[in-house]
């Protein structure tokens, strides 16, 4: 198993991680940094291409915040065969928010407040949408890679963060289990219940740590 953070290790923004499990390559989120513009705002997807034995089969988008999905079009440009998995609510929000991001980038360039061309267009987003696959919470779905001889499955769990947000459990037929919480909260909100997590133990836990060193949060 290989884990590589592609962005947002010490700051909020550009959350994205590469996980290689049983020869299946999976991207966990593809966020953009809201404090940056142009290429500096996206994760370092080139780190994957520099390794000939690595391949991106699937991507998981845990929720529709810019710092977790804003670079999804760039990920698809880099790896055109990737299948993108998310909840239905995240898909519905992505269909609204990503085109809005494309329009904002175009407007900032026109107004002279951006030094870079837009990273993607609304037309590109429409072309990429056939790669989106939606799943219900606690519904098992296939994540096996084209080079893997060992099946890998995924399952979403309510993350308790925003509408549609989900953590994901990754399980291989060899018995290894990885859980990625993404942004999560145990406490219920006005319209969002608190997060749910797998009952059985996992081998690897990838846990968000926002406010993790805050005394009040502890």
Label each region the model flagged.
Residues 14-19, 165-170:
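Short beta-strand scaffold segments in enzyme catalytic cores
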Residues 129-142:
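Short acidic-hydrophobic, aromatic-tinged amphipathic segments that line or gate anion-handling sites
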Residues 81, 128-131, 151-153, 175:
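A generic structural signal for alpha->beta connector loops
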Residues 2-7, 26-29, 153-159, 177-183, ...:
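Active-site-proximal beta-strand elements of phosphoester/diester hydrolases
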Residues 9-14, 21-82, 86-92, 97-128, ...:
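Pre-active-site segment of Zn-dependent metallo-hydrolases
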Residues 167, 185-218:
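Cap/insert and terminal regions of metallo-dependent hydrolase folds
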Residues 1-3, 21-25, 140-155, 172-178:
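Beta-strand-turn-beta hairpins that frame and shape the catalytic cleft
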Residues 9-13, 148, 159-163:
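A short catalytic or substrate-binding loop motif that flags glycine-/basic-rich loops and adjacent residues
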């Amino acid at each position: 198993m290989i884990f590589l953070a592609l962005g947002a290790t010490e700051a909020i923004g550009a959350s994205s991680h590469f996980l290689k499990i049983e020869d299946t390559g999976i991207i966990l989120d593809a966020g953009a940094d809201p404090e940056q513009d142009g290429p500096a705002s996206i994760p370092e997807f080139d780190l994957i291409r520099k390794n000939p034995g690595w391949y991106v089969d699937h991507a998981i988008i845990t929720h529709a915040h810019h710092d977790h999905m804003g670079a999804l079009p760039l990920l698809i440009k880099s790896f055109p065969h990737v299948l993108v998995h998310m909840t239905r609510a995240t898909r519905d929000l992505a269909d609204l928010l990503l085109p809005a991001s494309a329009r904002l980038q175009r407007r900032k360039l026109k107004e002279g407040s951006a030094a870079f061309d837009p990273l993607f267009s609304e037309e590109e987003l429409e072309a990429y949408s056939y790669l989106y696959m939606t799943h219900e919470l606690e519904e098992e779905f296939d994540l096996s890679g084209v080079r893997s001889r060992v099946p890998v499955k995924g399952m979403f769990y309510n993350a308790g963060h925003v509408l549609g947000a989900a953590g994901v459990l990754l399980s291989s037929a060899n018995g290894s289990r990885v859980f990625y919480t993404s942004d999560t909260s145990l406490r219920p909100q006005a319209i969002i219940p608190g997060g749910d997590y797998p009952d059985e133990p996992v081998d690897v836990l990838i846990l968000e740590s926002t406010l993790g060193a805050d005394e009040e949060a502890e």
